[in-house]
Amino acid sequence: MMSKSGRVAATAAAAGALLLAACSNPPLPPPASERSSPTAMVEAIRAAGAADKSVVQVAPLRDPAVDGFLDQAHAAENAGNYQDALDRIDAALKLSPDAPDILQFRAEVEILLRSYPAAEADARHSFMLGPKVGSLCASNWQTILEIAQAQDRGPDIATARAARDKCHKAGPVRM
């Protein structure tokens, strides 16, 4: 049997442990890199653009040299050479600096390079220059949404989600 002083000591020790546990900080959330991989983020962005079946879609006409740089950029990205892909995209942008689809592609590659501020800036710039409806619009806002989610920016998540949803423009009802 435990003596009275032993019970008091055990109770005090238990109370002290509870007090220390109550004062500890909650565990930190995992870093953004563990919550969402850049590859998964880009897949979600591209899926948002592909999923938008708006009545309005914009297809740019461009210099064949720009298409050559973009083909090289896609090949570099597929090979996992993200910096080389970014360099090719930058070369395309020198020839076509206000092309919103190229800016969006650069944003996606910047995500793969974990350059989130640059990616968000390019997605916003692409949106400002591009159509306000359709797949490119949806990709722009999905980019901003993915970055906001990765950085736990709650209010920005809701704003980006709502803006992305506004990109869809349904066609007229035909009877």
For the regions a language model picked out, list residue spans one by one:
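Bacterial Sec signal peptide processing site at the extreme N-terminus
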Residues: 17-41
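Canonical positions in the second alpha-helix
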Residues: 91-92, 125-126, 164
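TPR alpha-solenoid repeat register
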Residues: 102, 136, 140, 173-174
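Alpha-helical segment of the N-proximal tetratricopeptide repeat
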Residues: 59-84, 173
